[in-house]
């Protein structure tokens, strides 16, 4: 069995902790029990590796998110880079064609696909490994995982199974209903939340790509990717497939892709430098800045702060965040890099000051364009010709390689200047 994990997305639902580069899958909000925080992606990979260290995992992410993936996972997983955002079916088709043409995976191999925008315990990931077995019945082309509802919710689509058995044929799908209709689905039809988890054979995905895009060749799809039809996997595949089964899951699972879900999941635990009085109620505060947030007497709020902005919202207004955030959507200031990370401290029309973090053992080349000068000041750590207090300047058009012996933090100041005509 192989797995494809979808990690694209624009990051608006968890703004300002996420952005279009550092999307929600990369937001490190979950305590690992050792005082460190990890992301949904890191949690998913950790759980999968605990069950089967050798299973092949392919991450499908946008090209702008490649550095984020490598920053958190290194080179331990395969990665397909989407040149642009074209919805889930193009992303899955590209990953499937990569498995065929690059990794030479057997067309009959079961493939499990899911989006990394939920948080679940070990039993959920163990269930993923059993989905491929259902395909062996000779009649099922596609298997879904349905979540046993904990309440009638209008946040999810619903799967209507043919029975209440652990594995059942799928009778119908229903888009997000109101809570009364959802209650009826659950009571009368044993309905399940649609978790966006699919399993099928590789050749099935390739056939669907051929039908929709006229090709299942990786070289062809990557070349044409920006022009491929924007279409979801649900619309391109699920709604058109008559032979679908669903496996029922009744363990811990939470949609962590919104502040509403995150607030429930974190139980309104504070993250970062936060001080609150005992009159605060039902309020989640997440602070990724290096100065404190003081909260007094606030109720039913989500407060989140990062270099990208500050959110203060009543919880019942959180569903509107994705549309409202466009008014303050700026170039990201927090960016993961394969060597560590970059945090923009100050930005103006002609200058930018950033904190760079470089992991021990990493090597990075700092470049400058014509008309740009950079000054680097080492704050912590050591490397070749570097120690705390070292200052060096990179003139325009030059480059400097940093080899980190230990973890290094440094301040990078970039200044643009006008070029005299004789210097062209």
Which residues does each predicted region cover?
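Short beta-strand segments
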Residues: 6-7, 60, 113-115, 144-148, ...
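Conserved N-terminal catalytic core of the sugar/cofactor nucleotidyltransferase
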Residues: 2-5, 15-20, 30-113, 119-125, ...
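Left-handed beta-helix
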Residues: 202-204, 208-424
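Residue-level signal for inorganic ion chemistry
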Residues: 41, 95, 117, 159, ...
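Short coil/turn connectors at secondary-structure junctions
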Residues: 1, 54-55, 75, 107-109, ...
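Active-site metal-binding loops of divalent metal-dependent hydrolases
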Residues: 10, 117-118, 398
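Conserved core of the sugar-phosphate nucleotidyltransferase
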Residues: 122-217, 224-225, 245
């Amino acid at each position: 069995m192989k797995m494809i994990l979808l990690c694209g997305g624009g990051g608006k639902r968890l703004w300002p902790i996420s952005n279009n580069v550092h999307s929600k899958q990369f937001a490190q909000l979950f305590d690992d029990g050792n005082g460190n925080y990890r992301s949904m992606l890191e949690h998913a990979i950790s759980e999968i590796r605990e069950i089967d260290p050798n299973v092949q995992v392919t991450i499908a992410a946008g090209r702008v998110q490649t550095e984020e993936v490598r920053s958190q996972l290194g080179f331990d997983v395969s990665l397909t880079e989407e040149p642009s955002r074209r919805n889930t079916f193009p992303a899955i088709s590209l990953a499937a064609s990569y498995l065929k043409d690059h990794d030479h995976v057997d067309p009959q191999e079961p493939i499990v696909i899911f989006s990394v925008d939920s948080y679940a315990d070990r039993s959920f990931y163990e269930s993923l490994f059993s989905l491929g077995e259902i395909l062996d019945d000779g009649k099922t082309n596609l298997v879904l995982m349905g979540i046993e509802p904990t309440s009638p919710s209008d946040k999810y689509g619903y799967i209507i199974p043919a029975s209440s058995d652990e594995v059942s044929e799928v009778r119908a799908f229903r888009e997000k209903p109101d809570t009364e209709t959802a209650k009826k689905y659950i009571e009368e039809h044993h309905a399940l939340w649609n978790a966006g988890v699919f399993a099928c054979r590789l050749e099935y995905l390739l056939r669907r790509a051929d039908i929709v895009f006229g090709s299942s060749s990786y070289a062809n799809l990557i070349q044409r990717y920006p022009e491929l039809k924007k279409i979801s996997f649900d619309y391109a595949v699920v709604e058109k497939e008559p032979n679908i089964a669903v496996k029922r899951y009744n363990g811990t699972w939470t949609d962590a892709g919104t502040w509403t879900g995150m607030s429930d999941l974190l139980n309104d635990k504070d993250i970062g430098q936060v001080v609150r009085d005992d009159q605060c109620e039902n309020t989640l505060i997440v602070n990724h800045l290096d100065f404190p947030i003081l909260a007094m007497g606030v109720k039913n709020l989500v407060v989140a702060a990062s270099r990208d902005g500050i959110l203060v919202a009543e919880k019942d207004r959180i569903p509107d965040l994705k549309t409202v955030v466009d008014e303050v959507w700026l170039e990201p200031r927090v960016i993961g890099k394969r060597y560590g990370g970059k945090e923009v401290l100050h930005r103006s029309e002609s200058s930018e000051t950033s904190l760079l973090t470089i992991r021990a053992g990493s090597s990075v080349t700092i470049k400058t364009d014509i008309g740009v000068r950079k000054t680097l000041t080492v704050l912590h750590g050591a490397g070749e010709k570097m120690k705390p207090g070292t200052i060096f300047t990179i003139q325009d058009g030059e480059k400097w390689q940093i080899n980190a012996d230990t973890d290094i933090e440094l301040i990078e100041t970039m200044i643009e200047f006008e070029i005299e005509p004789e210097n062209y």
